[in-house]
Amino acid sequence: MTRVMDGLVIVLLGLVGWGLWRAGRAYVKLRGTRVVACPETEQPAAVELAPWQAAITAIVREPSLRLRDCSRWREIAPCQQACLGRIAEALEECVVSTILSKWYAGKVCTCCGRPVGQISRWRHQPCLMSPGMRIFEWKDIASENVPAVLRTHAPVCWRCLVAETHIS
């Protein structure tokens, strides 16, 4: 009898571990701010998914996508969340950090000419220079404005930001 119980406990622990792994994977994959064209206005909107809800549903089935926040909700009441289809189609590509990483890939600093290099969460982030020659960090940009800013601004490395802020 104890071998049967031991076997059931092992199977049960395996199922719990598998469920926790699926939940954790969904949470990590679905967190972060995304930029997507709002289906109602076709304007860029910064959205955040509800990763905990998706993680919980991922234990037993495909993660359920729901919005936790949207930059358009400040202007209009919460919507029908029609953008979720667009997000599901480009889950990784619409994450702000992915958009920025792809944009910086292969670029050189406007000030010093050094390669910007690969973007890493653990290193200093490259910056941007406006057409008016003002240098600023990513955190100074509203996420919904990232696509427009990247069309008009130039890449700047962290060293040049530090040098510029110490000179002025």
Residues covered by each model-derived region:
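Extracytoplasmic/periplasmic C-terminal soluble domains
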Residues: 128-168
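Short cysteine-rich clusters marking metal-coordination/redox-active sites
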Residues: 38, 67-70, 109-112, 154-160
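Cys/His-rich microdomains that often coordinate metals
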Residues: 42-45, 74-79, 83, 87, ...
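Short metal-coordination and nucleic-acid-contact micro-motifs, chiefly zinc-binding Cys/His arrays
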Residues: 31-34, 66, 102-106, 150-153
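Short cysteine/histidine-rich metal-coordination sites, predominantly Zn2+-binding motifs
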Residues: 51-62, 85-92, 98-102, 124-138
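Acidic, Ser/Thr-rich low-complexity segments on the non-lumenal side of membrane proteins
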Residues: 37-78
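Feature marks short, highly hydrophobic, charge-poor N-terminal signal-anchor/signal peptide-like helices
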Residues: 1-9
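Transmembrane-cytosolic junction motif
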Residues: 15-41
